[in-house]
Each structure stands twice: as structure tokens, then as C-alpha cells.
A protein has these predicted regions:
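Short functional hotspots at interaction and active-site rims
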Residues: 1-162
Length: 162
């Protein structure tokens, strides 16, 4: 136990409001395209992201690396990706280290959530979006190492040879 003569109150967020961000990170330019909502991420959210990517990169080849979430592998998403000429590549299961957007989410949590208090939900949302939108300008040096494209390639593995 720790005793003190004066009480110290720590502010914390009240309520259970939800703010979801679904994003795609350009590995070369560090540009982020996001879709946000206040409900749940589902196949329609992924379709919105595909439309946003297609609109932003008209006439360009777009390859999107995804994890194996069920809503990202459904027929609706795959059909739309084919229609928009977006190549979908699914990463191996349980490999968030290969997904660069997971590194961005970790960075956002560290910058926005750790030891921070927001007295209103809109301020919380703004802080998250400002951090995400700052990936091209703020903290470029620390983000350069965070988004490194140096992945270990394993040529021969006992697991792959069995």
C-alpha cells in the first residue's frame, strides 16, 4: 500500500463509444488511406476502403496485403477487388509482424493513448486522425525505421519442407 495525505485523482475516459479506423499504408510513400466508423468493421467497410484506394490510384496497379480476417476474405470483397483491379494478397496466419499497418497502429497507440486523457470523444478522434495523418510529415526519422521493408527471408525451413 502507498499512503499519502492528499488524494490523487486520475482522469479516465467515460463511456463506451467506439471509433474504428480501417487503413491502408503505402509502403513506399507512407501515405495512409483510412475509412472510419463508429460501429463495426465488416466487409462493407473493406469495400469502402477498396473504393477509396481505387479512386486515389486511378490507372495504377494496387496490391493490398491483408490479414486473414473473415470479413476481408469474403466473396463480396474479392469480387469488388477483381472489378476494381486491386490485387489482394493474404498474409500467413498469426504474422502481424509482416503487416506494416499493424506497426502504424502500435505507433498511434503509443502517441495517442499512453498516459493521455481526452475530456471529450471528438478530441480523442481528432488526436487519432492527426497522428495518422502526420505519418508523412511528423516524426519521419522514427517512422522510417518503424516502416522498414527489411524482412527476413527463410530459404529452407523444417516447417516448409514437411
Amino acid at each position: 500500500f502507498l499512503w499519502c495525505f492528499q488524494r490523487f485523482f486520475v482522469y479516465s475516459a467515460s463511456g463506451r463509444q467506439r471509433f474504428n479506423v480501417l487503413g491502408a499504408l503505402n509502403a513506399m510513400t507512407r501515405e495512409v488511406v483510412t475509412i472510419t466508423n463508429n460501429s463495426y468493421i465488416n466487409a462493407l467497410s473493406v469495400c469502402d476502403l477498396l473504393h477509396a484506394l481505387a479512386a486515389k490510384h486511378t490507372g495504377e496497379v494496387v496490391t493490398l496485403f491483408l490479414d486473414n480476417a473473415r470479413y476481408q476474405k469474403c466473396g463480396l470483397v474479392q469480387a469488388l477487388a477483381e472489378q476494381l483491379k486491386i490485387e489482394l494478397i493474404y498474409l500467413p496466419a498469426y504474422s502481424p509482424n509482416l503487416n506494416l499497418i499493424e506497426r502504424l497502429w502500435r505507433h498511434v497507440k503509443q502517441q495517442v493513448l499512453y498516459s493521455r486523457y481526452y475530456d471529450s470523444f471528438p478530441k480523442f478522434q481528432t488526436a487519432i486522425m492527426d497522428c495518422i495523418n502526420g505519418t508523412q510529415s511528423d516524426n519521419r526519422e522514427s517512422l522510417r525505421t518503424l516502416f522498414s521493408l527489411k524482412f527476413q527471408i527463410i530459404e529452407k525451413s523444417q516447417i516448409l519442407n514437411t
